[in-house]
């Protein structure tokens, strides 16, 4: 495996990942995982805005790389998107007066930072595979969270729909945070530093049942959510 298939480059604003075009994507995945693990001390606890360049990725490939960063780096990933500043002929520093046009450009990761609107942010719509929704406070999703999507908040997370992606509440270490969803079937559920995954056989069948996830004595519990009136 070519160790240079994936190169990490620290920048003033975060991290740039340079991906080679030639290797199979399985090699990119393995190299990415190795690089993340070897840089664990650098990433752990950091807040990173990440850009990638050098290789055009489809939605599924972007989703896989994002999951590696979120699950294995120990960092809080605040953005993950294609580098918009890639210019033709970078190697010989030749600038061009003509704009770089890309027809049928692959849709980039959509990223929602959250505007200062108080302590709770409402996100309206479905969070799709490859999207990262992150907020410093409580987060309410008015829609579904699809597999391959990632939602994070330093406070509580409420999903008014089916939650089937990666969810991280209390991302700043707050173990008092909770996760509530009308249908709770995430690929990964995390509160503070406590992580769990659903059993393989679990699935949302028929009418979903609202559920609540919380931490008590460093154990993550999931139970039916029956709010009192």
Swiss-Prot record:
Keyword Iron-sulfur: no
Keywords: Cell cycle, Cell division, Septation
Oligomeric and partner information: Interacts with MinD and FtsZ.
Role: Cell division inhibitor that blocks the formation of polar Z ring septums. Rapidly oscillates between the poles of the cell to destabilize FtsZ filaments that have formed before they mature into polar Z rings. Prevents FtsZ polymerization.
GO biological processes: cell morphogenesis; division septum assembly; regulation of cell septum assembly
Coiled coil regions in record: none
InterPro entries to which the protein is assigned, alphabetical: CAP/MinC_C (IPR016098), MinC (IPR013033), MinC_C_sf (IPR036145), MinC_N_1 (IPR055219), Septum_form_inhib_MinC_C (IPR005526)
Disulfide bonds: none
Tagged with keyword Cell division: yes
This protein's encoding gene: minC
Family of the protein in this entry: Belongs to the MinC family.
Residue ranges of the TM segments: none
The name this protein goes by in its record: Probable septum site-determining protein MinC
């Amino acid at each position: 495996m070519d160790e240079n298939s994936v190169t990490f480059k620290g920048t003033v604003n975060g991290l740039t990942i340079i991906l080679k075009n030639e290797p199979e994507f399985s090699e990119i995945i393995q190299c990415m995982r190795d690089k993340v693990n070897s840089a664990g001390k650098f990433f752990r606890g950091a807040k990173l805005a990440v850009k990638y360049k050098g290789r055009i990725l489809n939605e599924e490939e972007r989703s896989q790389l994002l999951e590696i960063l979120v699950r294995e780096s120990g960092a809080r990933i605040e953005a993950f998107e294609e580098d918009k500043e890639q210019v033709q002929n970078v190697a010989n520093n030749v600038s061009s007066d003509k704009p770089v046009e890309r027809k049928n450009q692959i849709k980039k990761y959509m990223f929602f930072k959250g505007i200062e609107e108080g302590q709770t942010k409402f996100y309206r719509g479905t969070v799709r595979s490859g999207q990262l929704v992150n907020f410093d406070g409580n987060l309410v999703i008015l829609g579904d969270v699809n597999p391959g999507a990632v939602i994070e908040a330093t406070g509580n997370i409420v999903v008014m729909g089916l939650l089937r992606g990666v969810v991280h509440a209390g991302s700043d270490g707050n173990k008092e945070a909770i996760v509530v969803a009308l249908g709770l079937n995430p690929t990964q559920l995390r509160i503070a530093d406590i992580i769990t995954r659903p059993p393989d056989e679990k699935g949302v069948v028929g009418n979903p049942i609202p559920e609540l996830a919380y931490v008590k004595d460093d154990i993550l519990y999931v139970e039916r959510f029956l709010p009192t009136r």
